[in-house]
Structures are given as C-alpha cells and as structure tokens.
C-alpha cells in the first residue's frame, strides 16, 4: 500500500508536468502569432480606402484581428504611410453567450455582452469611475450600429495587462462586455495617437475565416 507521502509526491509530480506542458504550449502559441504579422497587412488597403472616403486620418488607424488569441498581439496601431505595424497589444473580447477564452462570438444586440465586427470611428475621450480613461466608439456598419447604445468603448484593464504575459487565451471576465479592452500600456499609445490627430481615427475589427 502506498503511503500518504508517496501519494502526495505523485500528485505533485503530476501537477508539475501538467503546468510545464501548459507553459510549453503557451509559449509555442505566442511564438507562432508573433511571426504571423501578415494578418494585419492584408487589410491595409481596405482601411485606407475607408479613411479616405470618410475624411478620417489617412496616416494611422487601429486594427483588431479577432482570429488571433486574445492574449496575443490582437490589436495593432498601423502606419498607413509606410504600411507597417507601429505598436501591438492584447485585446479581450466580450464574455456574452457563445464566447469562450479560445473563440469569440459576435453580436450587435444590446445586452449581449459580445464584441462586434466592422469599422468604428474613435470618438471623444473621457474618464469613468469604473474603467478610467476610455474612448467612445461610433459604429459605422450594420454589424456594429448599436455601439453607442451598448456603450462599447476602448479602455484598459490591469487584468488584461497582467494576464496576457501568462497566457495566450485570456479567461473570460468582466474586463469586457463587448468593449475593446487592452493593456494600460497599449491604451496610453492609443491616447497619444488620438490626442495629436486633427481628424477622426478609424478602428477596424475583423475575424479571418
């Protein structure tokens, strides 16, 4: 019969190797997505045309690729003059029905707590007691026309800022009820971009099949 000490030792080794396997898998995913930057580049022309048509800033925009893991560089600041990625950061998706840490679900319905796809105008900057610095968004497509009524924002969360260093797939949380929730560091970069722009800046969210 195995002693209690032996049983505890066996369980300890199991959890050690289990955690080690998760870490190896996580870093493998992170390495894969760091080199897969072309998922942003394929949208450069489309977003520039939207910016040009609407009279928005034609030099910079923000892309959010929901086909990338939430803890990875899913959100990107794009330089449309040089066709390059300036900065990247994580972006949590909504926690509503049909969502998981691995797969986002999308909706334009009020109360759905889901993320929405399409083009958004980054509107006024403000502050709130719950999320701090935030930017309002106006939906420009049928897929996100309720963005204002749903109070969809760009804001940050310390949870996202910490967890994206630990996992490629952020566990669902109240960090996002459909908002584009990024790290505090990434939000500061977005703020600097918006503050110096005399024209509205476009945010474009998509998911590749």
Where do the model's predicted regions map?
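Cell wall/extracellular polymer interaction/catalysis modules
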Residues: 29-177, 184-201, 206-209
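Compositionally biased, low-complexity repeat tracts
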Residues: 5-8, 27, 174
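Alpha-helical hydrophobic membrane-insertion segments
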Residues: 15-35
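N-terminal Sec-pathway targeting helices
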Residues: 2-22
